[in-house]
Amino acid sequence: MSKQPSLSYKDAGVDIDAGEALVERIKGVARRTARPEVMGGLGGFGALCEIPAGYRQPVLVSGTDGVGTKLRLAMNLGKHDSIGIDLVAMCVNDLVVCGAEPLFFLDYYATGKLNVDVAARVVAGIGEGCEMAGCALVGGETAEMPGMYEGEDYDLAGFCVGVVEKSEIIDGAKVAAGDALIALPSSGPHSNGYSLIRKILELSGTDVAGATLDGKPLADLLMAPTRIYVKPLLKLIRETGAVKAMAHITGGGLTENIPRVLPQGTRAVIDVASWTRPAVFDWLQEKGNVDEREMHRVLNCGVGMVVCVARDKVEQALAVLRAAGEQPWLIGDIAAGDGAERVQLHNLKAH
């Protein structure tokens, strides 16, 4: 009877040395994102972070998210550099709408076979996103799981914790009829609607890698990283105290996300003609023959964030946002009403 040869973890498909090599490569990324409140570096069992000084009744705000099937498109195109920015954006933008300052971020990277170069590019993007948001990358998990994922395919999840003064939590409770709605532009589809986008690409037979739109590579338009709104919005909150509610426009578009911050007895009235929809959305609508209302229910259509302020604070809010580098515009207002349609879209284009 032949003796069973000695097996190693590597024989089973898990390369511990590759994992350790990745950790060494990303330590510098984590150091660049450090905040003074963070205690220690990567490698411990848990990450420690103090509450920043100056808070009287600090409330921690947490969030977790992924990037959906945009990840599949990233893998197909070999574009791994900015998907980490998307991951951070999806988490920190959800925190800032509560008025919270993001403190720290952790990531989860799962794959069938670890490609250290790809993973390092992804984590470098995560670090870039953390720098843009002002939060520290304090740790994460890299899981090599042969048999769970196909080859070097990978999945991502992000986790973020922020802090807000209890008396300054923004929850929409003060929103009232007559208030104004200000929009901030998106960079493209951000990280939502990509199952529809991929189906449109498939059925239209589009060569994503080779196609262009208005002289720009279609791949770049579709893979543009999700914008991170943290710093301009925190500036708006702190300098004006005027923000009553904010809605991060993700999956569900304007029609599903704005109602999440509206109190009973109010509805949002949006003027779709108040902005020029980026060409990539019109291209997707045409190629997929997508109904106009479906477009606004699935995609952000050029609007990444909506901010509610009192009507007499509009000019001040617009000025602060412009000074922070944003290009805001007045997109609509709040009206009284308890109907089933919490968001009314006016001036929808004919399709």
Swiss-Prot record:
Keyword RNA-binding attributed: no
Any one GO biological process = adenine biosynthetic process
Q: Which controlled-vocabulary keywords does the entry list?
A: ATP-binding, Cytoplasm, Ligase, Nucleotide-binding, Purine biosynthesis
Please give the InterPro entries that the UniProt record associates with this protein.
Answer: PurM-like_C_dom, PurM-like_C_sf, PurM-like_N, PurM-like_N_sf, PurM_cligase
Q: Which GO terms describe its molecular function?
A: ATP binding; phosphoribosylamine-glycine ligase activity; phosphoribosylformylglycinamidine cyclo-ligase activity
Q: Answer whether the UniProt record assigns the keyword Cytoplasm to this protein.
A: yes
Example GO CC term: the record gives: cytosol
Q: Which domain of life is it from?
A: Bacteria
Which reactions does this protein catalyse? 2-formamido-N(1)-(5-O-phospho-beta-D-ribosyl)acetamidine + ATP = 5-amino-1-(5-phospho-beta-D-ribosyl)imidazole + ADP + phosphate + H(+)
Enzyme Commission number(s) of this protein: 6.3.3.1
Q: What is its main location?
A: cytoplasm
Q: Quote the pathway field.
A: Purine metabolism; IMP biosynthesis via de novo pathway; 5-amino-1-(5-phospho-D-ribosyl)imidazole from N(2)-formyl-N(1)-(5-phospho-D-ribosyl)glycinamide: step 2/2
Tell me the compartments it is located in. Cytoplasm
* Enzymatic class: ligase
The similarity comment for this entry is: Belongs to the AIR synthase family.
Q: What is this protein called?
A: Phosphoribosylformylglycinamidine cyclo-ligase
Origin species? Azotobacter vinelandii (strain DJ / ATCC BAA-1303)
Gene encoding the protein: purM
